[in-house]
Amino acid sequence: MLMKTTAAHAPASQGTSGIVLDSLRVAYHGNVVLKPLSLTIEPGEVLALIGPSGSGKTTVLRAVAGFVQPAGGRILIGDTDVTHLPPYKRGLAMVVQNYALFPHLKVEDNVAFGLRAQKQPKALINERVTQALKTVGMSDYATRYPHQLSGGQQQRVAIARAIAVRPRVLLLDEPLSALDAQIRHNMVEEIARLHRELPELTILYVTHDQTEALTLADKIGIMKDGSLIAHGETRALYHHPPNRFAAEFLGRANILSAIALGITEVPGLVDVSCGGAVIRAFSQGSHHGYNKLLCIRPQHLSLTPRSAYSNRFNATLQSVHWQGDLTHLLCDVAGETVRMVLTHVNPLPRVGDKLALWFEPDDAVLIEV
């Protein structure tokens, strides 16, 4: 019920506010569950925190919401230190996976609940409710009860209730995990549209679903064992992950043994010995002679060169799996298994065929072991 209270009593926002976590630390009964974490979410930004169960991502969100008392560090929303403020004074709203709608109230009354708790004028309440329901595409369902709605519709109502109070910050705690795949896909598109319509809203989105994070977030933070192990702009983090865990958690990745040979004349590219060949790959820094790992996404491999600078691996096809629009190939490259995903392959290669796997230098990333 506290989660309802947060949205209900969040004071109306003026302007935009970001979130700053300054060495935030959380411990339960002396056991540290969140190691000192510093992170800035810019005003109007969508940041997705992802990670496996128990990684600490929900702990971060609950600390920002005010449901968990930090053992150290500070939490700022805008210019206000909210570390020791109760949830209802933080100017935020929260949406959780079980919707938390009042079953005895109509949709319009659920959406109006927070505004009435704020003792807003009736005319303003009606205006905000109408606008919020329109924003989430639920105007025609205003007089229905929650049990008359699908799961996706109930989640839209929960989001409408949250945005109706005009919070500075919106917290989303795995809001789509209880929905089936198709409805979840549609809701991801709806949340993306919502943020386009409300660009001033700062969103912290916690999920274990990489697709949701990649679709919605301006930036992504990856959690593991209570630590933030990677953080950056979504595209950059996907294409150039800093470590193996980030590479494999944020989409499929081929991880191959490699040795850095030295820098090249092209900034950011290094010569690498990998897969029985000397290739060029992207690197965050200058490396020479160190054992490294090479990360290549399956979809970045092709059977034909894309440029005069394309890298090449010689491979033997191990298996072919046709899945409609996509064909998955497993290949042996110098004793290591490499997966590739292709579209419009005709004719299909056969198991045992010798193949050349091509990829661009910037699509191969040197990472730490």
Swiss-Prot record:
Ranges for domain ABC transporter come to 19-250
- Protein name from the UniProt record: Putative 2-aminoethylphosphonate import ATP-binding protein PhnT
| Residue sites binding ATP per the record | G51, P52, S53, G54, S55, G56, K57, T58
Q: Which domain of life is it from?
A: Bacteria
Tell me the protein family, please.
Belongs to the ABC transporter superfamily. 2-aminoethylphosphonate importer (TC 3.A.1.11.5) family.
Any one GO MF annotation of this record: ATP binding
Cite the entry's keywords alphabetically.
ATP-binding, Cell inner membrane, Cell membrane, Membrane, Nucleotide-binding, Transport
Q: Name one Pfam family in it.
A: ABC_tran
Q: What does this protein do?
A: Probably part of the PhnSTUV complex (TC 3.A.1.11.5) involved in 2-aminoethylphosphonate import. Probably responsible for energy coupling to the transport system.
Question: Which InterPro entries does its entry note?
Answer: AAA+_ATPase, ABC_SmlMolc_Importer, ABC_transporter-like_ATP-bd, ABC_transporter-like_CS, AminoethylPonate_ABC_PhnT, Mo/tungstate-bd_C_term_dom, P-loop_NTPase, Transp-assoc_OB_typ2
Cross-referenced Gene3D superfamilies: 2.40.50.100, P-loop containing nucleotide triphosphate hydrolases
**UniProt key word Cytoplasm:** no
Its membrane topology, per UniProt?
Peripheral membrane protein
Q: What compartments host this protein?
A: Cell inner membrane
Q: Which gene encodes it?
A: phnT
Record's PANTHER family? SPERMIDINE/PUTRESCINE IMPORT ATP-BINDING PROTEIN POTA, SPERMIDINE_PUTRESCINE IMPORT ATP-BINDING PROTEIN POTA
A single GO CC term for this protein reads: ATP-binding cassette (ABC) transporter complex
